[in-house]
Amino acid sequence: MLASIAARRLIPCAASLLLLLALLAHPAQAQSDAPGGALDLGTIDFPTSASGEARTEFLTGVLALHSFWYPEARDHFRRAQALNPQFAMAYWGEAMTHDHPLWDQHDNDAGRAILAQLDAVRDASGLAWTDRERGYVDAIRTLYTGEGDIETRRDAYAAAMQRLAEQHPDDDEAAAFSALAQMSVEGFDLEDADDVVPVAAQLEELYRRHDRHPGVLHYLIHVYDSEPFAPLGLRPARTYAEVAPASSHALHMPSHIFRQLEQWERVVASNQDAYQASVDWQQRTDRPIHMRDFHSFGWLMDAYLALDRFDDACGLIQELESLLATAEQRGEDLGRMPSLREHFTSQYESAAAGTDAAGACAVVQ
């Protein structure tokens, strides 16, 4: 059935929805048994050539990767390398943290440097990897060292991951990362059934096997993040934050669906939780203030204004002003906070125009 869905390239959106709903009629039964480490990021079943603490650090890194928590994932992959320098997949994981495809961010130099480090270990003392793990490394090489521009290399990477998933049909991680890669190719249209249905079908099959897989839930929300498909995203949206509550991004992601459906109070709740989780992480790890989740902070502003909660919106502007002052006093990089302050102020005044709230948000700059 899934093969026939993927093969049909010209089907109307209504028919696509019916086909997907047929997939949703079968709830998942399988559960993973791999530990997620100290952070509550969900569980996965990902056999590796490493064991012990190196394996635990690696699995936590992959879980963070599934929630686009790239700095945290990088820390865990580096710890896995330190514990087991011959563990090839630990280098694969760190290379993965330098590509943020759905955010259009890619650090090619950093990725190539990690692969060069892996090659140096291979040449000096050899690597511990299986043929399947070698397939992961070969795939990521196409993204960083392949021919052509980044769009061409994304196409090649997506094809390589799809081959890996087909060669190892029991590897849920290969299938999940393959689906993400397909969404990342140039021209992928979230409102086009021809693009959405094959990827969604692949993810729905994974969901049937493991309905609490954090990557599957995350990527389902992304693939359904458009007006025609948003109702299908409610299922993963209701679960993802519960599965990976340590991740600010996991707490934020359900609001993509809630926003499409104009469920603004739920957008508020999601992004309050998401921003606070990022504050906890930033303070616990002693990182600069600009590394907080200001994306969720911005969505919180949008939701407050949509609900005419002008006092709350003004409170965000004042909080941002206070954070800027603190960061400047510490001599920290301000990141996008100054531009966000200007955007918030303009956004507030535009939304409040013609109301008693106009001009009422006094901020000393």
Language-model regions: role of each:
Residues 12-25:
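Bacterial N-terminal signal peptides
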Residues 42-56, 125-133, 285-288, 332-340:
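TPR-adjacent "capping" and linker segments in tetratricopeptide-repeat scaffold/adaptor proteins
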Residues 53, 86-88, 171-174, 212-214, ...:
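Residue-level recognition of tetratricopeptide repeat
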Residues 53, 60, 94, 138, ...:
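Structural register within alpha-helical repeat arrays
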Residues 69-75, 94-130, 138-152, 185-194, ...:
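Inter-helical turn/loop elements of alpha-helical hairpins
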Residues 75-107, 167-176, 213:
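Short, charge-rich amphipathic alpha-helical segments embedded
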Residues 82, 119-120, 162, 166, ...:
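Amphipathic alpha-helical segments of tetratricopeptide repeats
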